[in-house]
């Protein structure tokens, strides 16, 4: 049988080995805890970045929608103004045409009522043109 001292030395050596391994386990656990903290911090930062990006995209989408709506309104307004301009141009053209026609009719009537003048060729031309207008 072994002596008590040898037996006690073996026990002490084993306790030291267990103690060293316990310290290694504790050190490993501390490292794991630091890794876990880094992972949590990274996740939180990533979530903040995602939230900020989502908020920015939402703002940009609202701005885009607003600009598209304003563009559509301006296009409709431009179309209305273009239509009004065409109508105005047609009215102005019709007024000018009516004024020319009225003056022409007055000139033709004046020539018909005045006695024959020496320039009968012009009178025939006016007569032909008045027949075209009437």
From Swiss-Prot:
GO terms for biological process: attachment of spindle microtubules to kinetochore; cell division. One of its GO terms (cellular component) is nucleus. The keyword Nucleus applies. Disulfide bonds: none annotated. It is found in: Nucleus; Chromosome, Centromere, Kinetochore; Chromosome. Transmembrane segments: none annotated. Keywords: Cell cycle, Cell division, Centromere, Chromosome, Kinetochore, Mitosis, Nucleus. This is Kinetochore-binding protein 3. It comes from Caenorhabditis elegans. The gene is kbp-3.
């Amino acid at each position: 049988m072994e002596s008590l001292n040898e037996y006690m030395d073996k026990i002490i050596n084993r306790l030291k080995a267990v103690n060293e391994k316990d310290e290694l386990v504790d050190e490993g656990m501390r490292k794991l805890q630091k890794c876990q903290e880094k992972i949590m911090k990274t996740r939180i930062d990533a979530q903040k970045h995602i939230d900020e990006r989502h908020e920015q995209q939402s703002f940009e989408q609202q701005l885009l929608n607003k600009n598209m709506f304003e563009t559509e309104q301006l296009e409709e307004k431009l179309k209305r103004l273009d239509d009004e301009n065409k109508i105005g141009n047609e009215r102005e053209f019709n007024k000018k045409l009516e004024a020319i026609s009225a003056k022409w009719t007055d000139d033709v009537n004046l020539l018909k009522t005045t006695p024959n003048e020496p320039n009968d060729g012009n009178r025939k031309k006016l007569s032909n043109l008045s027949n075209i207008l009437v």
